[in-house]
């Protein structure tokens, strides 16, 4: 039951974080490209690398906390479904170049940021 509580609490925090972070990014950069979704997914990619690597090396992160942070918080923060929908809408609007850039940049950047999170965790 403790694990479920961690997931629920951190999930709510992750959802709220996505709402505010993506909204802020859209205010800064506009909506010509799905910048808000891109930003939350990059942050999530970095955090999953950091959390998973750190939790494997340290007893400071309990299994329940790790699950709460990754499944709960990062599950609420990141969004593959919105990424898919926004990319589909770009394709539907004839924006093949922007849609392709979104797929390429999102996947490659998230992989790089996951790796950076792992590097940072190893340095801690």
UniProtKB/Swiss-Prot annotation:
Membrane topology: Multi-pass membrane protein
A GO term for molecular function: fluoride channel activity
Catalytic reaction equation(s): fluoride(in) = fluoride(out)
Entry keywords, A to Z: Cell inner membrane, Cell membrane, Ion channel, Ion transport, Membrane, Metal-binding, Sodium, Transmembrane, Transmembrane helix, Transport
Subcellular location per the Swiss-Prot or TrEMBL entry: Cell inner membrane
Residues annotated for Na(+) binding in this entry: 75, 78
Gene Ontology CC terms: plasma membrane
Family according to the record: Belongs to the fluoride channel Fluc/FEX (TC 1.A.43) family.
NCBIfam families: crcB (TIGR00494)
UniProt name for this protein: Fluoride-specific ion channel FluC
Organism lineage string: Bacteria, Pseudomonadati, Thermodesulfobacteriota, Desulfuromonadia, Geobacterales
């Amino acid at each position: 039951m403790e694990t479920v509580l961690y997931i629920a609490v951190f999930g709510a925090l992750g959802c709220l974080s996505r709402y505010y972070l993506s909204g802020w990014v859209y205010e800064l950069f506009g909506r010509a490209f799905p910048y808000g979704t891109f930003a939350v997914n990059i942050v999530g990619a970095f955090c999953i690398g950091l959390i998973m690597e750190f939790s494997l090396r340290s007893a400071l992160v309990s299994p329940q906390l790790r699950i709460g942070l990754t499944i709960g918080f990062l599950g609420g923060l990141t969004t593959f479904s919105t990424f898919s929908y926004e990319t589909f809408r770009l394709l539907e609007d004839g924006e093949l170049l922007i849609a392709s850039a979104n797929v390429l940049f999102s996947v490659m950047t998230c992989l790089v940021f996951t790796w950076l999170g792992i590097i940072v965790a190893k340095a801690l």
